[in-house]
Amino acid sequence: MTTKRKVAIVGSGNVGTDLMIKILRNAEHLEMAVMVGIDPASDGLARAGRMGVATTHEGVAGLVKMPEFADVDFVFDATSAGAHVKNDALLRATKPGIRVIDLTPAAIGPYCVPVVNLEQHVNAENLNMVTCGGQATIPMVAAVSRVAKVHYAEIVASIASKSAGPGTRANIDEFTETTSKAIEAIGGAAKGKAIIIMNPAEPPLMMRDTVYVLSEAADQDHVEASIEEMVAAVNAYVPGYRLKQKVQFEVIPDTAPLNIPGHGEFSGLKTSVFIEVEGAAHYLPAYAGNLDIMTSAALATAERMAQSMSQA
């Protein structure tokens, strides 16, 4: 019989609550122990209580005092970048070897996008899940990168305003910075750029991501096959992840190069990928694919780490 590792979630907002429901319903190697918030009236804490999960509204300071904390092996932090630095320090002061999965853009640990680099980090003590936009788009950059050298990649993540809680809104600058860096570090681009758009349309629109990749000249069939293979790999843990339309290519000749401000002229192959992410509607409705891809990636990561601990 599989030993389930107990987990706590810090942050009882949209992301934390969605993740809790996924763990309770779908986890094979993890067991929900504590939901941590700072607002005693939050819907996430109320829902956790109704689902039989222990709660505290006193933040991480409250968590480390709880008897349940003694058995917790994993903590998911779904707060904000600024709060995560303090949370991680307090958790380690109490339990030095604890595994922390960071769902904020703080990035004090290595970046992780499961389909690209999870196996390199199964023993990490703090792992950063980049951002929702990063989880959706970096696999596409990496897919091109394994076929041809990528000089520049730019992503535009469009999410429904209703899916963005106060934590997401407070972290816009951190979102763009962390995603841009991870496009380079994990995606393999020499230079990365990220843009996020919160769309106030009613009814809310599903998460859409556009990925532009400028690479050396390459066989377009090979690039497309690599992208389709990567989409299938992401879809294994995010069932609503899909190509919205066929991959588009444009050959940029040496005689008419593109000028990228700040980066100079470019010729080669431009690949455009259009992604749609439909949420599983565990907490917010299906338009909130940005929640789903983040929590699904975090769950897949922790499940693999827990499995590795059991095999050790």
Swiss-Prot record:
Active-site residues, record numbering mapped to chain: 132 (acyl-thioester intermediate)
GO molecular function, one term: acetaldehyde dehydrogenase (acetylating) activity
Top-level division of the source organism's lineage: Bacteria
InterPro entries: Acetaldehyde_dehydrogenase, Acetylaldehyde_DH_C, NAD(P)-bd_dom_sf, Semialdehyde_DH_NAD-bd
Record flagged with keyword RNA-binding: no
UniProt keyword terms in alphabetical order: Aromatic hydrocarbons catabolism, NAD, Oxidoreductase, Plasmid
EC assignment: 1.2.1.10
Pfam family, one: Semialdhyde_dh
Annotated residues for binding of NAD(+): 12-15, 163-171, 290
GO biological-process terms attached to the record: catabolic process
Record's catalysed reaction(s): acetaldehyde + NAD(+) + CoA = acetyl-CoA + NADH + H(+)
HAMAP family found in the cross-reference section: Ac_ald_DH_ac (MF_01657)
Similarity comment: family membership: Belongs to the acetaldehyde dehydrogenase family.
Official protein name in the record: Acetaldehyde dehydrogenase
Originating species: Pseudomonas putida (Arthrobacter siderocapsulatus)
Upper lineage: Bacteria, Pseudomonadati, Pseudomonadota, Gammaproteobacteria, Pseudomonadales
Gene: cbzQ
